[in-house]
Swiss-Prot record:
It catalyses: D-sedoheptulose 7-phosphate + D-glyceraldehyde 3-phosphate = D-erythrose 4-phosphate + beta-D-fructose 6-phosphate. PANTHER family: TRANSALDOLASE. Transaldolase is important for the balance of metabolites in the pentose-phosphate pathway. One of its GO terms (cellular component) is cytoplasm. It comes from Thiobacillus denitrificans (strain ATCC 25259 / T1). This is Transaldolase. One of its GO terms (biological process) is pentose-phosphate shunt. Pfam families: TAL_FSA (PF00923). HAMAP family: Transaldolase_2.
Length: 359
């Protein structure tokens, strides 16, 4: 039995943080779904930029689009959306078997809209209609403007993956927006089963940023905390999830068919080679969560993973570690704000490079 399938038996979904025409056409994604238990896909402009640069399967379509379509963003969509639809179709049986709890594929709104609430709502609605698949998640950044857009999209019954979250406070703001959006949807008499959302908490980037601050402090005490911020934060974010979605405000919505907003662990490939390659996988296995893995991390889990449920263990230790960061002067909320801003800029840079590649 493949080790990776043990993870799903423990209540966590494994998604692939990659999508390309190669994966679809050579059967690799279908094989991961069948053999590894992969049950969803995430994508972003950086992933599509790499796919376009490395796959031969886009050349004919790109040549045709350069002749027929003057708008570069529409060329991009004409290349990407067929892949998104094909991945959605591949995962549709799983989506249906899970009654809509799993089997999703993510597609991002244009990064230039990260600080534009109405623009994000309009773009998300357009992409939702354009892809026309029930198991699409439209990715919206977790900026304050993006969170406001997410609340509106939830009210409209559009599935959303809120991305670029780097702190417990940012995750909690997203949970609260989801509950408010569902409340408005319930008040209108709409079907609450038609709204699905996840909250993507980015991990390795947090440790990279916090480790740099700890190194700057330079004490033995600070250096002993390197590589611990992200996992501690994730464990406490999960406690916030439980408090929100086991609490009275959500219980009434759940009785009408509303689904809780699962946390999704993102940025789970280690960036520091000194750290264990499953640092952001094994300690965070737990029910009602998702981990989206790059190919290399999925291969590591398959090869030597030891999945046991650890997410609800050592919570007091995680809380003590976060208190220690504060005592040392490491402001995790300030780090999160910087990382979110940098993440938006990184995706915008990748998106513009992708458009230049297509143009």
């Amino acid at each position: 039995m493949n080790i990776t399938k043990d993870v799903s038996r423990l209540g966590q979904s494994l998604w692939l943080d990659n999508l390309s025409r190669d994966l679809l056409r050579d059967g690799a994604l279908a094989k991961m779904i069948a053999e590894d238990g992969v049950s969803g896909v995430t994508s972003n402009p950086s992933i599509f930029q790499n796919a376009l640069a490395t796959s031969p399967h886009y050349a004919d379509d790109l040549a045709r689009l350069r002749r027929e379509e003057a708008d570069v963003e529409r060329r991009y969509e004409a290349l990407v959306i067929p892949d998104i639809r094909d991945a959605c179709d591949l995962l549709l049986p799983l989506f249906e078997r899970s009654a809509g709890n799993d089997g999703y594929v993510s597609l991002e709104v244009a990064p230039r809209l990260a600080y534009d609430t109405s623009g994000t709502v309009d773009e998300a609605r357009r992409l939702w209609s354009l892809v026309d698949r029930p198991n699409l998640l439209v990715k919206v950044p977790g900026t304050p403007e993006g969170v406001d857009a997410f609340e509106t999209l939830t009210q409209l019954g559009i599935n959303v993956n809120v991305t670029l979250l780097f702190s417990i406070a940012q995750a909690q703001a997203v949970f609260d927006a989801y509950v408010r959006g569902l409340g408005k949807r319930a008040a209108s008499g709409a079907d609450l089963r038609r709204a699905k959302a996840v909250a993507s908490l980015f991990l390795s980037r947090v440790d990279t940023a916090v480790d740099a601050e700890l190194a700057g402090i330079g004490t033995q005490e600070s250096l002993s905390l390197r590589g611990k911020a992200a996992v501690a934060m994730a464990k406490l974010a999960y406690q916030a999830y439980l408090e929100t979605f086991r609490g009275p405000a959500f219980t009434a919505l759940a009785a009408r068919g509303a689904r809780p907003q699962f946390l999704l662990w993102a940025s789970t490939g280690v960036k520091n080679p000194d750290y264990h390659d499953l640092l952001y996988v094994e300690p965070l296995i737990g029910r009602e969560t998702i981990n989206t893995l790059p190919d290399k991390t999925l291969a590591a889990l398959r090869d030597h993973g030891q999945p046991v449920p650890q997410l609800e263990q050592a919570v007091d230790e995680a809380s003590a570690q976060l208190a220690e960061f504060a005592r040392l002067g490491v402001d995790l909320d300030a780090v999160a704000a910087r990382l979110q801003d940098a993440g938006v800029k990184q995706f915008e840079t990748s998106y513009q490079a992708l458009l230049a590649q297509i143009g």
